[in-house]
C-alpha cells in the first residue's frame, strides 16, 4: 500500500509493477511519471536538417535540447501553443516520443521498400518510416476507424509526405493482396498505455486488470493475421507503450 499511496496509483497496479520489476524499480518508474516532461519532437528530414531546425526553433524563443539517442530528436519547452510555431505549421517536425522513434530507427528500412503500419494513428511511425524511404518506396498506413485515419491524413497534409497511402482497415481482417509482400511491418498494437502515464495521468484510473488480459489477447489475434504480410527476409517490428510484461515479452 505504501507505493500505491505515495505515488497515487491504484493498489492492483502497484502490486503488478512490483511483481514484474521489483519494489525498487517500481518506485523509480512511478516517481518518473510525476516529473514534468518536455515535448519530444522528430525532425522531418525531407524538409530540413536537425541543425537548421534547432536554430529556427531557438530563434522563435523555444528552448531546445538534443535527444538522448537519435541525432534528429529534440525536446522542446518554453512554448505555449505549437500552432504558433512556423516550423510546426510547415511540417518541419512532428511531436513523437523518442522511444516511439527508436521503434522505427531499429528497423532496416531502405529506399524503395514497402512498409506497412497496421495500427498507425496518429501516424508518428508512418511518417518516420516515410522519411527514411527518402521519397522512394511506399508506406501503407492503416487504422480501424474513420476518425483515426483522418488524424493520419491531417498529419500527412501538414508534413507533406507523398509516399504515404492511408486506408481504413480492421487489422483482424486478413488482406490476401498483401500476403508476403511487405519489407517492413510496423505493429504498434493497442495496449494499456501504462508506459505513458506521465503524459496521460487518467490511464491508471481507467484501466483494469481484466482489460490487461483482453488487450494481450487482442494483440495475439492481430499478430496472428499481420505476420503473414511480411515477405521472406522481411521484418516485423512489434511495439507497445506499456510496461506490462503480459502485453510485451509474455
List the predicted regions and their residue ranges:
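S-adenosylmethionine
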Residues: 1-250
Amino acid at each position: 500500500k505504501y507505493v500505491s499511496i505515495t505515488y497515487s496509483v491504484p493498489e492492483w497496479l502497484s502490486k503488478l509493477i512490483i511483481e514484474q520489476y521489483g519494489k525498487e524499480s517500481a518506485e523509480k518508474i512511478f516517481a518518473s511519471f510525476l516529473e514534468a516532461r518536455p515535448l519530444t519532437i522528430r525532425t522531418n528530414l525531407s524538409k530540413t536538417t536537425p541543425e537548421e531546425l534547432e536554430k529556427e526553433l531557438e530563434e522563435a524563443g523555444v528552448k531546445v535540447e538534443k535527444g538522448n539517442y537519435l541525432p534528429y530528436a529534440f525536446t522542446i519547452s518554453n512554448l505555449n501553443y505549437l500552432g504558433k510555431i512556423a516550423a510546426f505549421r510547415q511540417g518541419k517536425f512532428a511531436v513523437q516520443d523518442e522511444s516511439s522513434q527508436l521503434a522505427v530507427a531499429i528497423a532496416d528500412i531502405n529506399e524503395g521498400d514497402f512498409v506497412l503500419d497496421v495500427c498507425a494513428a496518429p501516424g508518428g511511425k508512418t511518417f518516420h518510416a516515410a522519411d527514411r524511404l527518402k521519397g522512394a518506396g511506399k508506406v501503407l498506413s492503416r487504422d480501424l476507424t474513420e476518425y483515426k485515419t483522418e488524424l493520419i491524413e491531417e498529419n500527412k497534409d501538414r508534413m507533406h509526405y507523398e509516399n504515404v497511402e492511408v486506408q481504413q482497415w480492421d487489422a483482424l481482417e486478413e488482406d490476401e493482396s498483401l500476403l508476403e509482400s511487405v519489407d517492413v511491418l510496423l505493429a504498434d498494437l493497442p495496449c494499456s498505455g501504462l508506459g505513458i502515464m506521465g503524459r496521460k495521468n487518467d490511464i491508471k484510473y481507467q484501466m483494469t486488470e481484466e482489460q490487461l488480459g483482453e488487450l494481450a489477447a487482442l494483440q495475439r489475434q492481430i499478430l496472428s493475421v499481420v505476420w503473414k504480410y511480411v515477405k521472406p527476409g522481411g521484418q516485423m517490428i512489434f511495439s507497445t507503450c506499456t510496461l506490462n510484461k503480459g502485453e510485451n515479452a509474455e
